[in-house]
């Protein structure tokens, strides 16, 4: 009888202090983040950006140069950031992880275009890449002919030779000297020519060119004057 009363008291005490059992919490366990291994494909570096064109080196895949320089490509020498990057095949979780963190409006789009660099995405869709179309960096289309014209160096303009001018007195003295030597400078007359050039103030080459250019005109003029004198 005493045992039963003790059990009842214990039951009353337990009933006053105890609280209703809390339901077990559902622990959400997330899978360990999967490491995303990226592959770097062809090199997209524009080697003709300075001239306004678009020329790539043709490197098809990034290969580390050495352990000391792992970010330099052994094939083309460019930095790894110039190569097109995408996750390795079979890593569907990486694409899924990217879609979970993007808004719904962006998730509705095709994921491959989001994973590609702007230059690669533009080349796949056939769109002009900004910065290569127009000189101001717009989105204008660039034809092959315009690219060739930009890459083709402009022809070098020949330097125009300055024309030597003579005074009236110099022309008269050169005419008299040319008639005296027969409009031709002989080798044995080099000393005479040098003395005349120093006296008149002209260069030897300028005197020679003047005699060559005016030889026929002065001869024709002299012949006409002789004919007129004979007719009179």
Curated annotation (Swiss-Prot):
Q: Which domain of life is it from?
A: Eukaryota
- Is Disulfide bond one of the keywords? no
What Gene3D superfamilies does the entry give?
A: Homeodomain-like
Q: Major location, coarse class?
A: nucleus
InterPro entries reported in the protein's UniProt record: Homeodomain-like_sf, Homeodomain_ZF_HD, ZF_HD_homeobox_Cys/His_dimer
Which sections of the sequence are annotated for DNA binding?
159-222
In this UniProt entry, which residues are annotated as the site Required for DNA-binding?
211
- Which segments does the record annotate as ZF-HD dimerization-type zinc fingers? 40-86
Entries under Pfam families matching the protein? ZF-HD_dimer
Q: Name one GO cellular component term.
A: nucleus
Which Gene Ontology MF annotations are present? Answer: DNA-binding transcription factor activity; transcription cis-regulatory region binding; zinc ion binding
Keyword Membrane carried by entry: no
- Tell me the segments the record calls region Disordered: 1-25, 126-170
Which UniProt keywords are present, listed alphabetically?
Answer: DNA-binding, Homeobox, Metal-binding, Nucleus, Transcription, Transcription regulation, Zinc, Zinc-finger
Q: Which GO terms describe its biological process?
A: regulation of developmental process
Question: Which compartments is it annotated to reside in?
Answer: Nucleus
The annotated regions of Acidic residues compositional bias extend over 1-11
Purpose of the protein: Putative transcription factor.
Instruction: Let me see what the UniProt entry remarks about domains.
Output: The homeodomain differs form the typical one by having namely 4 instead of 3 extra amino acids inserted in the loop between helix 1 and helix 2.
Mind telling me which NCBIfam families this protein's record contains? homeo_ZF_HD (TIGR01565), ZF_HD_prot_N (TIGR01566)
Q: How does it assemble?
A: Homo- and heterodimer with other ZFHD proteins.
Tell me what this protein is called: Zinc-finger homeodomain protein 5
Q: What organism, scientifically named, is this protein from? A: Oryza sativa subsp. indica (Rice)
By which gene is this protein encoded? Answer: ZHD5
């Amino acid at each position: 009888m005493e045992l039963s009363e003790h059990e009842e008291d214990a039951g009353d005490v337990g009933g006053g202090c105890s609280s209703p059992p809390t339901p077990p919490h559902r622990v959400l366990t997330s899978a360990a983040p999967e490491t995303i291994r990226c592959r770097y494909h062809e090199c997209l570096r524009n080697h003709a950006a300075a001239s306004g064109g678009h020329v790539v080196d043709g490197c098809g895949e990034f290969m580390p140069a050495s352990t000391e320089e792992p970010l330099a490509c052994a094939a083309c020498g460019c930095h790894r950031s110039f190569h097109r990057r995408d996750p390795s095949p079979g890593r569907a979780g990486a694409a899924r992880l990217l879609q979970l963190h993007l808004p719904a409006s962006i998730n509705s789009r095709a994921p491959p275009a989001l994973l590609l660099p702007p230059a690669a995405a533009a080349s796949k869709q056939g769109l002009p890449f900004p910065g290569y179309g127009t000189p101001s960096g717009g989105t204008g289309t660039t034809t092959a002919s315009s690219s060739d014209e930009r890459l083709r160096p402009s022809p070098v303009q020949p330097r125009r030779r300055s024309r030597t001018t003579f005074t009236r007195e110099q022309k008269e003295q050169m005419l008299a000297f040319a008639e005296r030597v027969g409009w031709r400078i002989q080798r044995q007359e080099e000393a005479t020519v040098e003395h005349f050039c120093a006296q008149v103030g002209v260069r030897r080459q300028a005197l020679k060119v003047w005699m060559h250019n005016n030889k026929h005109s002065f001869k024709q003029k002299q012949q006409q004057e002789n004919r007129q004198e004979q007719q009179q």
